Amino acid sequence: MKRAYAVSQYGKCYEQYCKEYLPQQAKEIFDKAEQYYKEFVKNDMPDLGENLMAKNMLDWFTILSFYEASDHKLDGEVLLNIKRKAADKMRFLGKFVNGNKSRWPCKMFEKTYVNFNKMKKEHQDKGEWMDTWDVKINPDHRTEGFNFYLIGCPIAKHAREHGYDKLLPYLCKTDHYLAEVMHARLIRTQTEALGGDHCDYWYVGDESPALAEYKDLEQI
């Protein structure tokens, strides 16, 4: 049976974790998570449209569903464990993508967000996608890597309004993991989850001289 939360990349990961570490409770957790997920989507889904950015909200609802279904056993530390394992399985990408040498991933990300901004404007002119993120491309005028801001995060808004503000920073922290697989690093100084007015992203190669300036920066 394909469950509703299977649309999220986290669904299968959480199921595998439960089967390994909570085998006696796994089936019950899956059933409860399914119901929680449906309720979150029905009652709490903002007007984000159908796009890659909107899938981030479905990931968040999946994480919350397993968190609640397990009586909070599947907490933030478990989320980091799950995401780290998923990233480790993708280490083969490092053979093909090197953040110190490859420019195409940055160009691809930039094109993706340029297209998103274009679609967002078209939809918002019609009164749609009104709750989605604002994306500012290279607001810090970086000449290296890829820099952008996400502003008005609907996930952070949901977390604050529903008492999940302690859980969300763990999800934000997982942004670092896939970058490391591709010999890159994420330099981030603030997130909305931790009270910032935006989430900043600056991806550079893991051999970048820029990292020296931020060597004491906590991964958030």
What are these regions (language model features)?
Residues E50-L52, A159-H162, L211, D216-E218:
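A short, structure-level motif marking secondary-structure boundaries and short turns
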Residues D134-L194:
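Short, hydrophobic/π-rich interface segment
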Residues C18, F66, S70, H123-Q124, ...:
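Hydrophobic, Leu/Ile/Phe/Ala-enriched alpha-helical segments that form helix-helix packing faces
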Residues M1-K73:
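N-terminal, charged low-complexity regulatory/assembly segments
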Residues L58-E161:
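Amphipathic interaction/junction segments at domain boundaries or subunit interfaces
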Residues F61, S65, T174, G196:
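Short, well-structured alpha-helical interface segments that form or flank functional binding sites
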Residues K73-G76, H141-R142, L178-R185, D206-A212, ...:
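Secondary-structure boundary elements
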Residues A6-Y14, T189-A193, H198, V204-I220:
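Activation/maturation switch segments at domain boundaries
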